[in-house]
Amino acid sequence: MGKAAAPSRGGGCGGRSRGLSSLFTVVPCLSCHTAAPGMSASTSGSGPEPKPQPQPVPEPERGPLSEQVSEAVSEAVPRSEPVSETTSEPEPGAGQPSELLQGSRPGSESSSGVGAGPFTKAASEPLSRAVGSATFLRPESGSLPALKPLPLLRPGQAKTPLGVPMSGTGTTSSAPLALLPLDSFEGWLLKWTNYLKGYQRRWFVLGNGLLSYYRNQGEMAHTCRGTINLSTAHIDTEDSCGILLTSGARSYHLKASSEVDRQQWITALELAKAKAVRVMNTHSDDSGDDDEATTPADKSELHHTLKNLSLKLDDLSTCNDLIAKHGAALQRSLTELDGLKIPSESGEKLKVVNERATLFRITSNAMINACRDFLELAEIHSRKWQRALQYEQEQRVHLEETIEQLAKQHNSLERAFHSAPGRPANPSKSFIEGSLLTPKGEDSEEDEDTEYFDAMEDSTSFITVITEAKEDSRKAEGSTGTSSVDWSSADNVLDGASLVPKGSSKVKRRVRIPNKPNYSLNLWSIMKNCIGRELSRIPMPVNFNEPLSMLQRLTEDLEYHHLLDKAVHCTSSVEQMCLVAAFSVSSYSTTVHRIAKPFNPMLGETFELDRLDDMGLRSLCEQVSHHPPSAAHYVFSKHGWSLWQEITISSKFRGKYISIMPLGAIHLEFQASGNHYVWRKSTSTVHNIIVGKLWIDQSGDIEIVNHKTNDRCQLKFLPYSYFSKEAARKVTGVVSDSQGKAHYVLSGSWDEQMECSKVMHSSPSSPSSDGKQKTVYQTLSAKLLWKKYPLPENAENMYYFSELALTLNEHEEGVAPTDSRLRPDQRLMEKGRWDEANTEKQRLEEKQRLSRRRRLEACGPGSSCSSEEEKEADAYTPLWFEKRLDPLTGEMACVYKGGYWEAKEKQDWHMCPNIF
């Protein structure tokens, strides 16, 4: 390389031209008038800076590639912060020329070469031992830091765009925090493990909407101790240094070392959660539409792409050789011309040719060197990426084998528990559907990192003490408030609420369906490629379905409609709230054994339930959206109430379980009183996906609000825990008025019954050992609100359908041509012809894809839609519902616009699309 003058202390670009020095060596820097590589200049502290003088430029010299590219790091260790060390070397001063440095050469002092260049200077000592034997060079005063080539990290290691480990609790960063990705973070946190070891130090990594933790940084490449998805997690704070993350039945109790670290983590977690929710909403889809699972064809395409890239790299190498060959031939020809005797009149022309040839030689040499550098780097990184890809493939296979092996161990432990002596007499009460034993061993992570919660943590936030009605008659008289009903009266509207006899229908309904065939199918072979994905986008055979659609499942929630019929006659709004709460819980009673998924409705599919004669209601559902899949529902009762909702079901496979999250508000209005109730559904979780007996759990909080009186009911679905003293599937709640005064306490289980107890007096309890304080409610004896109907005979062979569910898919005359009863694949499955049902299901899905493409094409380029989801929403208009702004929730929701029952009466279905 040519020599370069160092910039003055007063400023200068300090290496701005460095990136082009290997291509064009005569480039002055116009912004600060300093000389770029290939020029000489002297600087002065006070006098004017001299103009750059051109220098003869030799052919660029290149050091060995091994000195320019650092070796891969063999272990993921944190790098210490670069510490600037003081040296005794004098820096360039006023009137004194700076030290001139040569380019990197083999054998020179700076031949270690990592980051060496025309504006760098060898430091007196290595910066850090954390990156192997590579030495970092200190830049001169007033110049930018020397560029440091970044070693290739192993798969699983994280790095910021600046090449600095991401800061977190307990780490130090040499880059400002503002430059780091805001939704990515890593560092040390204290995590609650168990009561024996308390909080333990763990390395946490936040990225891609997932929070994972390891015992140390060395485990990042091979062993993840746990992961929580932030898109479904709730972030809460306990104290000045605490963070609580809850997702379904999983909770992380974390502590930071300081308030600053805690705030940084909370900010990063909230940003990552918001981004994950946006991604989840953007990528939700229906069954098997445009996102197929990884197939051998995909792998073949990947290898084909890699092969093409390799061929292109070979072509580039050949072109490089040709350029070098022809350049050498041209140089030889010019040398031969110089030796020839040429007449004097041709001397000027030959001089011009020589000048142009010299310029071409300089340019071509620089291009050849740059091309050679690129080829060598590309070959090195190509091999590294090939190894990384192979490593990831091996890790995936290893992960699949590990999960399958763990699932088998889990199943064997479950069987051992069932056959163990001294089992509870009533296994259903002890929740045997889940694994009640935890595998423990020397290598088990459960020894330290399994969360153990006591009863206080899983239990309710209040304590109930039952008192006698006679003893507290005076208190009851003064505390009834809005209640006008005597609790001990025989005609209390809440007494016997669940004992209402079922209505008798004039139409004889069926009481059984064909038995479920015994088809064996490996669920893991399908689910292993679906971790973290939206299940509605994954095509699955009907073997995992039940012969009902999601629209029919929504209608099945009306099985205990008599609770609402009875609530119409309540004169007290808080008593009415008790019945509404019992109705909201009763909708989960049918899910306890229903482990099969319903059919995803086709866009425009409908389902009606016309049972005015026996149930006194009419119900209509319509699939109103394809991206994301969403269903609108409207119910009218002749007893004086109406219910409507738009529900979007988001379901994802998390490796060990499936998480089902219903999104959307449910509205219930009583015409006589004008009371308007709004609530949302809880989260459902399906466990033991890979091996073992499937079981379902409900968890989360539900708040029911009466927007007329501002009465509220707080329901809590307690998730199942191995070590909880609470009963399985327990639900608790408190009904309070607009002033926050509690009137009723609710208790029960979502699969059996619900009771309510009238509150006579409430007082705070003494603080517990953990500092938490509960409210003590003195109540009267509990009254039964709702009790589950027994299942029909032989229900275990009929998908555990209830009496109402058995009638939902029964063929009826006069329904719309889009009704779920007319769906052919669902009908074939009900009859036990599953192979034909799978073939028909594929035909319907392909027909739906074709209709979707036509809608997107009809939207046109001139439309205001920016995404495919917006285009489809803009192109498709529901037939019986319309989008309106909900004034209570502030959300857009589909509400019934009328016309269906009139069309049915006339049997005029010309407006219905042909979807089957």
UniProtKB/Swiss-Prot annotation:
Using the chain's own numbering, where are the disulfide bonds? Answer: none
Record-stated family: Belongs to the OSBP family.
What's a GO cellular component annotated to this UniProt protein?
acrosomal vesicle
Q: How does it sit in the membrane?
A: Peripheral membrane protein
InterPro entries according to UniProt = OSBP_sf (IPR037239), Oxysterol-bd (IPR000648), Oxysterol-bd_CS (IPR018494), PH-like_dom_sf (IPR011993), PH_domain (IPR001849)
Q: In which tissues is it expressed?
A: Expressed mainly in retina, testis, and fetal liver.
Note the Pfam families from the entry: Oxysterol_BP (PF01237), PH (PF00169)
Main localization category: membrane
Biological-process GO terms, alphabetical: lipid transport; spermatid development
Q: Where do Polar residues bias regions lie?
A: 99-113
Which terms are listed as keywords in the entry? Cytoplasmic vesicle, Differentiation, Lipid transport, Lipid-binding, Membrane, Phosphoprotein, Spermatogenesis, Transport
**Provenance organism:** Homo sapiens
Q: Function of this protein? A: Binds 7-ketocholesterol. Acts during spermatid development where its function is required prior to the removal of cytoplasm from the sperm head.
The name of this protein is: Oxysterol-binding protein 2
Would the keyword Transport turn up in this protein's UniProt record?
yes
